[in-house]
């Protein structure tokens, strides 16, 4: 027994000595991890800094398959970036969160987070504890939201001019900015058609379908009150149906097939003839039942098991003057039903007249040489939905136009959610910096120091805007500070004229929700990165 004890005590002593050394060595580790996380996250923020604002640059992104995307939308750039570091990935998630919450300001939110992290580095190097920094940042955030809310002015949804200005400001920083005079009214009209301005508190953007069609230019984009389908009409003879009765089926109009492991053996031609006769009678019966309900436009869901529509069925439908559109995607069905008031039918026995939707006109429109579209307009019981048709000379332009329209729609959605506007052009951030610096003087000790650092970090937005517009960032931000100190709350960077002016007179406005959401999400992310002191890899 005693001989067993001796080594144990030795081991304990060794372990204690080892632990002492380990504790000494590991004391630096949390700080190293923190700095590593901060520098990785800052690298992501620096990567998209140049794409902020109307004079920001675009990024060309090539994926593994060789597909190219050209965009300056922060969320899109970060989504497609290959980010390995877990802390850097948090900034990608941050941008996604801002995209979901507000839909705009996805670049700003990451830049603000990067700047706050930069301030954290300086504070940590001075030996301030991460928890103190984190709590001070939370205080600064609460005060910041108050300041932004004070700066904002209420807006009514009936004030169309203001809504247009907000949408135009959002579109001005995009590749398609020269078309903002067309796309802004289109976005405003689309949102206003799908909500009741008096009672709405949010907008479901799924009610606004964006259909992309190659060919033409962005000038050819249009807003359609009704349904637009890119699928071709299957029977060539019928391209226009007035007083349309529209049915939507989820079963196939073709001969039934046997199960996978069954076979039918046909031994002579008389039996073959009988099989064909049966098939003909079966399909004719299906088509007659469809015709009996008064249906004259038939939409057929895409089927992967067998032909959704056989040639024989198409022949009969053609004879009965029924327009047929096949290969309707499963995910479009809900939108189609809401738009034209039809109900999907899974079996022929349920195909009755009350399942049909009705519309004034279903017409296949020829797009002078670049394909065809099917438009169904004048729906009798329209749900509140609209379709935006986006045209463009190539895939890159169309996709960027779609993203830009989505951002403009999101800006108007923000105004529906929170009916307040704030100036753009870096004005709110400079005001924040100024007022938070004043606020920091009322605090004592380390808190005051940390809030001051938070305030200084806010200046990154006007500084980046000035830099991207080719102005001198230091002199521009200094002048802005002076103007705000003299009480000009709405002085901001006028990128078009290359100077500082009252940004509200230039109609550069953004929803309050975008700024508040960006500030809140950026601060939350920075606080979580600060609190991390170790990264553990698991198998």
From Swiss-Prot:
Q: Which keywords fit this entry according to its UniProt record?
A: Acetylation, ATP-binding, Cell projection, Chaperone, Cytoplasm, Cytoskeleton, Hydrolase, Methylation, Nucleotide-binding, Phosphoprotein
Q: Which family does it belong to?
A: Belongs to the TCP-1 chaperonin family.
**Which positions bear N6-acetyllysine?**
21, 288, 302, 319, 326
In the Enzyme Commission scheme, what number(s) does this protein have? 3.6.1.-
Any one Gene Ontology BP term:
chaperone-mediated protein folding
| Key word Ribosomal protein present | no
Enumerate the residue ranges of region (Disordered).
1-29
Summary of the function given for this chain in its UniProt record? Component of the chaperonin-containing T-complex (TRiC), a molecular chaperone complex that assists the folding of actin, tubulin and other proteins upon ATP hydrolysis. The TRiC complex mediates the folding of WRAP53/TCAB1, thereby regulating telomere maintenance. As part of the TRiC complex may play a role in the assembly of BBSome, a complex involved in ciliogenesis regulating transports vesicles to the cilia.
The primary gene name is: CCT4
Protein localization: Cytoplasm; Melanosome; Cytoplasm, Cytoskeleton, Microtubule organizing center, Centrosome; Cytoplasm, Cytoskeleton, Cilium basal body
- Residues where ATP binds: 53, 105-106, 174
The lineage, from the top, is: Eukaryota, Metazoa, Chordata, Craniata, Vertebrata
Q: Which residues carry this modification: Phosphoserine?
A: 36, 184, 202, 444
CDD domains for the chain: TCP1_delta (cd03338)
Question: What's the protein here called?
Answer: T-complex protein 1 subunit delta
Its source organism is: Homo sapiens
| Annotated residues for binding of ADP | 53, 105-108, 172-174, 425, 510
According to the UniProt entry, its GO molecular function terms are: ATP binding; ATP hydrolysis activity; ATP-dependent protein folding chaperone; protein folding chaperone; RNA binding; unfolded protein binding
Omega-N-methylarginine modified-residue sites: 19
Reactions catalysed according to its record? ATP + H2O = ADP + phosphate + H(+)
What intrachain disulfides are recorded? none
């Amino acid at each position: 027994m005693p001989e067993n004890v001796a080594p144990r005590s030795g081991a304990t002593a060794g372990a204690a000595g080892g632990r002492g050394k380990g504790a000494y060595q590991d004391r630096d580790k949390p700080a190293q991890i923190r700095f590593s996380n901060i520098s990785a996250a800052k690298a992501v923020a620096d990567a998209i800094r140049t794409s902020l604002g109307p004079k920001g640059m675009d990024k060309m992104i090539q994926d593994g398959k060789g597909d190219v995307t050209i965009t300056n939308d922060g969320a899109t750039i970060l989504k497609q970036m290959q980010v390995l570091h877990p802390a850097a990935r948090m900034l990608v998630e941050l941008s996604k969160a801002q995209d979901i919450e507000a839909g705009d300001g996805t670049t700003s939110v990451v830049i603000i987070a990067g700047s706050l992290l930069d301030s954290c580095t300086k504070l940590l190097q001075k030996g301030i504890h991460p928890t103190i920094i984190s709590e001070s940042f939370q205080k600064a955030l609460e005060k910041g939201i108050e300041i932004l809310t004070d700066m904002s002015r209420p807006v009514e949804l009936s004030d169309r001019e203001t809504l247009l200005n907000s949408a135009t400001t959002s579109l001005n920083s995009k590749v398609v900015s020269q078309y903002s005079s067309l796309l802004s009214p289109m976005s405003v009209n689309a949102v206003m058609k799908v909500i009741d301005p008096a009672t709405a508190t949010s907008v479901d953007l799924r009610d606004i379908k964006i259909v992309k069609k190659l060919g033409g230019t962005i000038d050819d984009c249009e807003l359609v009150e009704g349904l637009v389908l890119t699928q071709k009409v299957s029977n060539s003879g019928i391209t226009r149906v007035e007083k349309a009765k529209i049915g939507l089926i989820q079963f196939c109009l073709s001969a039934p097939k046997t199960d996978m492991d069954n076979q039918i053996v046909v031994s002579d031609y008389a039996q073959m003839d009988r099989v064909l006769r049966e098939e003909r009678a079966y399909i004719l019966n299906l088509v007659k039942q469809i015709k009996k309900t008064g249906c004259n436009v038939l939409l057929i869901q895409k089927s992967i098991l067998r032909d959704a529509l056989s040639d024989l069925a198409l022949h009969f439908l053609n004879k009965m003057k029924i327009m047929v559109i096949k290969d309707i995607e499963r995910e479009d069905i809900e939108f189609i039903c809401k738009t034209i008031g039809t109900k999907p039918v899974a079996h022929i026995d349920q195909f009755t007249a009350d399942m049909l939707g009705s519309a004034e006109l279903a017409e296949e429109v020829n797009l002078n040489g670049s394909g065809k579209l099917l438009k169904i307009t004048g729906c009798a019981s329209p749900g509140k939905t609209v379709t935006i048709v986006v045209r463009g000379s190539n895939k890159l332009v169309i996709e960027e136009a779609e993203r830009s329209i989505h951002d403009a729609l999101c800006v108007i959605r923000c105004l529906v959610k929170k009916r307040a506007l704030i100036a753009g052009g870096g004005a709110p951030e400079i005001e924040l910096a100024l007022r938070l610096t004043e606020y920091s003087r009322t605090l004592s000790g380390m808190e005051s120091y940390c809030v001051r650092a938070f305030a200084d970090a806010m200046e990154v937005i006007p500084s980046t805007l000035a830099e991207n517009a080719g102005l001198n960032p230091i002199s521009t931000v200094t002048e802005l500070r002076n103007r705000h100190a003299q009480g000009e709350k709405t002085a901001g960077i006028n990128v078009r004229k290359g100077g500082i002016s009252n940004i509200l007179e230039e109609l550069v406005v953004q929803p309050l929700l975008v700024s508040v959401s960006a500030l809140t999400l950026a601060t939350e992310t920075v606080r979580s990165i600060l609190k991390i002191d170790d990264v553990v890899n698991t198998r």
